[in-house]
Amino acid sequence: MLSRDKWFAVVCDAPLVSIDLIVRDARGRVLLGWRRNDPARDCWFVPGGAIRKNETLDQAFARITQTELGQPLLRAAARFRGVYEHFYPTNFAGIPEVGTHYVVLAHELRFDGELVPADDQHSRFSWFEPALALADPKVHAHCKEYLA
């Protein structure tokens, strides 16, 4: 894993490649976490994470689902939803005038397990009916793209 300074240098100079998880339960609700840090601070956002150097997509998917959902899941069990571009005017370090650019590989999956406690990225998780998430101004616009 990169140091904070090296990670910031990457954010300054390159797009990040990440996996977003569009997680649904048996009722069709979508899982969102309340973000506590930039670039999507104070918004509801889907779980996900950046892919690390030399990490295969399958390895990244298993690591990200372990971190976000509490168990490693197989990418083959998810449905690939497409490639998205996310541009933010802010960054994780809060340094002014440095935005964050993500190239996102969105995957949809069903999950009926117990949710893990909140982490340094999210203060809490909640299940949303898709129509209510689309209408909620606190759900980030990038997440609404997945639900429209």
Residue ranges of model-derived segments:
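Conserved Nudix-box catalytic region and its N-terminal flanking loop in Nudix hydrolases
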Residues: 29-72
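Compositionally biased, intrinsically disordered linkers/stalks adjacent to structured regions
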Residues: 37, 147-148
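Active-site segment of metal-dependent pyrophosphate-handling enzymes
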Residues: 17, 70-114
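Conserved beta-strand and immediately adjacent loop positions that scaffold enzyme active sites
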Residues: 20, 29, 124
